[in-house]
Amino acid sequence: MEYNAKNIEYKWQQIWKKNGYSEPKDDYSLPKKYILSMFPYPSGRLHMGHVRNYSIGDALSRYYRNRGYNVLQPIGFDSFGMPAENAAIKHKIHPKIWTYDNIDYMTKELDALGFSFSKKRLFATSDPLYTRWEQEFFIRMYEKGLVYRKSAVVNWCENDQTVLANEQVEDGKCWRCGHEVIQKEMPGYYLKITDYANELLECLKDLEGKWPNQVLTMQENWIGKSYGLEFEFKFDSSSKILLDGMDGFKVFTTRPDTIYGVSYAAIAPEHIVVKKLLEKNILDDATSAKLKFILNQSPKQRQSIDKDGVSLGLNVIHPLTNELIPVWCANFVLAEYGGGAVMSVPAHDERDFEFASKFNLNIKQIIKSDTLPYCEKSGVYINSELINGLAYEEAREKIISKFEKEGWGNRVTNYKLRDWGISRQRYWGAPIPMIHCKKCGVVPENISNLPVKLPDDVVITGEGNPLDKHSEFKNCKCPKCGSQATRETDTMDTFFESSWYFARFASDEKTWEDVAFDKKSVDYWMSVDQYIGGIEHAILHLLYARFFQKALRDLGYLRDCEPFDSLLTQGMVLKDGSKMSKSKGNTVDPDDIINKFGADTARLFILFAAPPQKELEWNDSAVEGAFKFINRLYDRSDNAYKTEILPQINHSNLNKDEKYARLKVYEALKKSTDVFENSFAFNTLIAACMEALNGLNAQNNKDIWTEGYFIILNLLEPIIPHACHELSNELFGLKNFTKLSLKDEVFVKDSLNLAITVNGKRRSEIEVSAFESDDKILEIAKQEVSKWIEGKEILKEIYVPNKLVNLVIKG
């Protein structure tokens, strides 16, 4: 048969579309598999990272369909976000038009690759129907106390009049206009993800062995649970006077055992003490200028530069020794962790040591060591009256107990995890369904009025939020009292959309207008059996999605605690050693590969070039090699005959080459189960199929050719579906796309080829019966290498079953 990729692929894509091949069945009695690859942003064109992601997911989906599973593999578009606004400015086009034009084009690209996505469940997160339910979730969370409004310091571009994410601040300047970014306090909405901090952490245990350890560790560190002592540093009398009688401030430490080594207290630039000092204008000009300079740096900037700070001219009293401790403002102290203040022990903390060394502050050693800083939780305590000579755990407990007994402090649990700020001063996002009324305050929109839709008649300039200037959108009636009011003009962080899309996919599309989730279908499909996406989403997206699953469970929308049962993080696609990017000029357009070689070639190369978890280096010659293999597969089709069942073969009557050919075919079949259900090492399965095809080539038995071809097409169908469907349809009526069984007799070897080594050096090889005794094998081996051992004393005779014989001789 001749291989014409373009014609064959178009033919089968139309057949699959017509017969609903990709659509899940409504029969909920069937075993199910929900395979989901992270949905794309509609940037305009697919890139090779997309092709890799979706090739993996589609291979798994087809494998399980062939084995009788009800499979859901949906696709959609994460379509809100800044790139659409940037395109609107650059190309003078409305973000909505740009977005949906891109969705149309990328959908055609996905179709051309033969991915078996459920098209009935396709949606974009910017669709009004999706926004409608998203806004309902927001309101229900608000009613439950999971959403609140507060003022916080944000990155602000005065020129563009907008808040910037940390990633959009480059060297202290706006990534888009280059204007200096300042820190500005602004009101915004926050989700109380911290209410779920402990559950998010504890449930990671349920994902062990099913999620990559790296991802679990990253999430654990991001949540950052820590145990310690919280107490109050009291100001001395002169400091109290400066601060209008303020008594002191709370600090949190995970190392109460080192409290005798405190030589200064450090507070964050945003701390109330700093604010009071600046408001009272009692600091000298240099100190005030330094504080304002640090305040205008984003938290991310502060963490990436050298330790810096300024003395505030205040003192607190050490609770145990009554010594006066100087108070400093330091750029390394986080405002939102532990109250924004720390006790600093430079002898036993690297960060504190660096700061103290820079500013010549006292360094007091309280654990014996030859070098400083010594940060281990072990050693002999010195200069510590209550705990001298104690071990770490005992010392820690004694200090905490002392503080609790005296009423100075308490043992507490802290988390690094912060509440999630979702307010964005953007147009192209889901409107926050809140209304500002002079009589009622801030109130949610009525559910019956959802969705709050974006107005189309806006002009995107990049300066400020267009919604804030749109009077028709902004002016409204209060849903509570009917008075004139104003609508919230901030839109939601786009992570909000991607935090629940997987559950929407699981809901029967026929119910989408009536309910957020159809309970029967969602309970059947959720949780996602296999989730696939890049490691770059390990923290934010995956953590927010896990939070949403739990919050929506508690609101009565969903049942399960975790959204994704198993996670595969695929590596990047590289070219010339670097990640593909337009700026580097090293991109490869999937359309070009499809037009030249076909979709199956692209898919075969992607899955053969490297294990999915590893980075993949693009190689043009390897792409051509994949194309040649598919052609070779076609060329060999004439060696098989038409049948809809496997030929019946008497294995004992076969010659050596025939048995070897069958063995290689069934070894590939045996490997396939682990590859598709566990390791995802598609490259090893493809290599096994290539080896099996070579084994078939080395013999002429038509029955064995037919059996082998029948099985090889079954194994390769998830990887190169168009070619395999065409060949199978011609030869086997597609009857081979089902679960196939192993045949035990194939794996029984009649003979063994054993290497013989003398003192570790290979000298010869023998072929013996697979049923020969060990003693007989050793006897045959010694005869074979007699000229190397004659007259020598044999010290050891070692037989490694099925592999080799090693003889150790003296001299």
UniProtKB/Swiss-Prot annotation:
Binding residues for ATP: 582
Keyword ATP-binding found: yes
PROSITE patterns registered for this protein in UniProt: AA_TRNA_LIGASE_I (PS00178)
UniProt short sequence motif 'KMSKS' region, positions renumbered to this chain: 579-583
Gene3D superfamilies: 3.10.20.590, HUPs (3.40.50.620), Isoleucyl-tRNA Synthetase, Domain 1 (1.10.730.10)
Signal sequence residues: none
Motif ('HIGH' region): 40-50
Subcellular localization: Cytoplasm
GO molecular function: aminoacyl-tRNA deacylase activity; ATP binding; leucine-tRNA ligase activity
Alphabetized UniProt keyword annotations: Aminoacyl-tRNA synthetase, ATP-binding, Cytoplasm, Ligase, Nucleotide-binding, Protein biosynthesis
GO biological process: leucyl-tRNA aminoacylation
SUPFAM superfamilies tied to this protein: Anticodon-binding domain of a subclass of class I aminoacyl-tRNA synthetases, Nucleotidylyl transferase, ValRS/IleRS/LeuRS editing domain
E.C. number: 6.1.1.4
Record field: catalytic activity: tRNA(Leu) + L-leucine + ATP = L-leucyl-tRNA(Leu) + AMP + diphosphate
GO cellular component terms, semicolon-separated: cytosol
UniProt-listed NCBIfam families: leuS_bact
Protein family: Belongs to the class-I aminoacyl-tRNA synthetase family.
Protein name: Leucine--tRNA ligase
